[in-house]
């Protein structure tokens, strides 16, 4: 899978403990709009997806997380690798540690029906909702609206992936 870009905040000590948590994310585009999870509480957009569990493939994690977070059922035969983003930064939990994450993005189609979500407690608290949104709106919101305690590098990652998709003609 191609490397889309890296985000390295260079604010960490490599002598600390690395916390590694890779994730997989769904890119579903319909009629010029992209499926995003909107945090109503903190007003930001993210691609549906999340952490890859032990012994789980990137594709299976993306399918599972997309259904849990967005209620969308991915059509497995439609999955195409898009690329990944490598992120490294100081840990949110311990200043002596650092966080490493590869975020794998997949283009895919989904079934027409939208099912109920199966949200984690923090996702329910943030009022995660599925929205098909114009990419420029999601980019603007992620970069220009105050998001409370949310980590800005994650929001910038999503904005940059949306910009790449636009540059490569996925929304025309």
Q: Across the structure, where does each feature detected by a protein language model lie?
A:
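Short, solvent-exposed loop/turn segments at secondary-structure junctions
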Residues: 18, 44-45, 87-90
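A generic structural micro-feature
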Residues: 18-19, 96-102, 122-127
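Acidic, metal-coordinating catalytic segment for phosphate/diphosphate chemistry
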Residues: 1-25
């Amino acid at each position: 899978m191609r490397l889309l870009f890296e985000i390295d905040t260079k604010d960490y000590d490599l002598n600390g403990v690395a916390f590694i948590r890779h994730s997989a994310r769904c890119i579903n585009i319909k009629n010029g709009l992209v499926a995003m999870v909107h945090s109503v509480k903190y007003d930001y957009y993210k691609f549906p997806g999340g952490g890859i569990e032990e012994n789980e493939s990137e594709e299976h994690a993306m399918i599972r997380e997309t259904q849990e977070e967005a209620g969308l059922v991915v059509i497995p035969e439609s999955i195409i690798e898009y690329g990944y983003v490598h992120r490294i930064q100081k840990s949110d939990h311990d200043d002596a540690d650092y966080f490493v994450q590869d975020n794998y993005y997949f283009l895919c189609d989904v079934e027409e029906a939208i099912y109920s979500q199966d949200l984690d407690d923090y996702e329910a608290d943030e009022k995660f909702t599925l929205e098909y949104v114009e990419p420029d709106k999601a980019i603007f919101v992620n970069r220009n609206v105050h998001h409370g305690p949310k980590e800005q590098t994650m929001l910038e990652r999503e904005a940059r992936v949306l910009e790449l998709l636009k540059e490569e003609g996925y929304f025309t």
